[in-house]
Swiss-Prot record:
InterPro entries per the UniProt record, alphabetical: MFS, MFS_dom, MFS_MdtG_subfamily, MFS_trans_sf, Mutidrug-R_MdtG, Tet-R_TetA/multi-R_MdtG-like
UniProt keyword annotations, A-Z: Cell inner membrane, Cell membrane, Membrane, Transmembrane, Transmembrane helix, Transport
Family per similarity comment: Belongs to the major facilitator superfamily. DHA1 family. MdtG (TC 2.A.1.2.20) subfamily.
Bilayer-crossing regions: 19-39, 56-76, 90-110, 113-133, 144-164, 171-191, 222-242, 251-271, 288-308, 317-337, 376-396
Identification of the protein by name: Multidrug resistance protein MdtG
Domain of life: Bacteria
GO cellular component, one term: plasma membrane
GO MF annotations in UniProt: transmembrane transporter activity
CDD domains found in the cross-reference section: MFS_MdtG_MDR_like (cd17391)
Locations listed in the record: Cell inner membrane
Length: 418
């Protein structure tokens, strides 16, 4: 379709990867509204057993993703990022299809683990775009790309619930597999990458990857920052609906109110992420990162004292606007400190820390709420984010944020990457 030596239009690749991240985010979240119902349909009975199995099938995907991500990242640095996008999209499509055919809970659990092993579309999309964009536009591009997964994750539960009510639980898995296969086709036909495969013996080992970074200590601290961001985000998820019900009292549309309050941070992040990413390109992503963490602390504390669902919704909207800058700012700093040759592994390591946060965050939130009540979760989360802000600030001060090379700053907005 394209000449192999033709220049790569990174903006077109950004558009297609955004669509791919949107479809992947939607596909993952399509099944979330009825996951416990599907577990129940596979023969799990009893309140405690249903809770346990629902938690297992949810968390095992992130756990196995954390294990597999470094392997896929290394393979991406050897074979190219496009082939990893194709592998991920097609693999997840096949697994989703098989999930719709599962006959018992053990089969479903194994398939959820396999989904984590074969995933990784979004981190590989980040790595692909990070190696093709002009460095001085990293914040804007990665911020824009992040909105793809966020918007898909917002739309997915709504569409998934409607589809499950209309067609039943199993057909939704087949529809999800179709969405992922569409993602595979779009990637195959329209994503372009010029990549020279690297022999395995020439690949850097993990220690050499870390040593080759411009600022290894800063990058390691950014991995920890990513983990804490996800812990803070996930800690609120298990108790949000119950907290909203306590605030709302006896109202008929509690599910609608809870859904609205759950989704408003994502809507705010869609608006803020590209804009704050672009601002970070001008003033430095490290400033955006610290400011967003501090603002998050100031918004989390009053959430513990709200009296109505709408007060909580307003604060969560503002929190989403701040949170929309966090991961893109981290990713931009990673781009500044890693060469293209190791970008796949750096982003995959970051994804592993993110997955660990996705697993541990809900556990922490559920534990705190069980012992100290719903309101305490927001105060504990605020303390976690405050620690993150202080830790990140000290790490940036000790290591210094790496400035953009002058030649990157001078590139024109319409640059094509060869």
């Amino acid at each position: 379709m394209y000449s192999s030596d033709a220049p790569i239009n990174w903006k077109r690749n950004l558009t297609i990867t955004w669509i791919g991240c949107f479809l992947t985010g939607a596909a993952f979240s399509l099944v979330m509204p009825f996951l416990p119902l599907y577990v129940e349909s596979l023969g799990v009975t009893g309140h405690s057993a249903l809770n346990m199995w629902s938690g297992l099938v949810f968390s095992i995907t992130f756990l196995f993703s954390a294990i597999a991500s470094p392997f896929w990242g290394g393979l991406a640095d050897r074979k190219g990022r496009k082939i990893m996008l194709l592998r991920s999209a097609l693999g997840m499509a096949i697994v989703m299809l098989l999930m719709g055919l599962a006959q018992n809970i053990w089969q479903f659990l194994i398939l959820r683990a396999l989904l984590g092993l074969l995933g990784g579309f979004i981190p590989n999309a980040n790595a692909l775009i990070a190696t093709q964009i002009p460095r001085h536009k990293s914040g804007w591009a990665l911020g824009t790309l992040s909105t793809g997964g966020v918007s898909g994750a917002l739309l997915g539960p709504l569409v998934g619930g409607v589809l499950a009510d209309s067609y039943g639980l199993r057909p939704v898995f087949f529809m999800t597999a179709s969405v992922l296969f569409l993602c595979f086709l779009l990637t195959l036909l329209f994503i372009r990458e010029q990549f020279q495969p690297v022999a395995k013996k020439e690949m850097l080992h993990a220690r050499e990857v870390i040593a080759s970074l411009k600022s290894p200590k800063l990058v390691l601290s950014l991995f920890v920052t990513t983990l804490i961001i996800q812990v803070a985000t996930g800690s609120i998820a298990p108790i949000l609906t119950l907290y909203v019900r306590d605030l709302a009292g006896n109202v008929a549309n509690i599910a609608f109110i809870s859904g609205m309050i759950a989704s408003v941070p994502g809507v705010a992040a869609l608006i803020s992420a590209p804009r704050l990413g672009k601002l970070g390109d001008r003033i430095g992503p490290e400033k955006i990162l610290i400011a967003a963490l501090v603002i998050s602390v100031l918004l989390l504390i009053p959430m513990s004292f709200v009296q109505t669902p709408w007060q909580l919704g307003l604060l969560r909207f503002l929190l989403g606007a701040a949170d929309g800058a966090l991961l893109p700012a981290v990713q931009t700093l990673l781009v500044y400190n890693a060469t293209n040759q190791i970008a796949g592994r750096v982003f995959s390591y970051n994804q592993s820390f993110r997955d660990i946060g996705n697993v541990t965050g809900p556990l922490i939130g559920a534990s705190v709420s069980a012992n100290y009540g719903f309101r305490a979760v927001f105060l504990v989360t605020a303390m976690v984010v405050l620690f993150n802000a202080v830790y990140t600030g000290l790490s940036l001060r000790r290591t210094g944020a790496t400035a953009l090379p002058a030649q990157d700053v001078e590139k024109d907005d319409t640059s094509l990457v060869r």
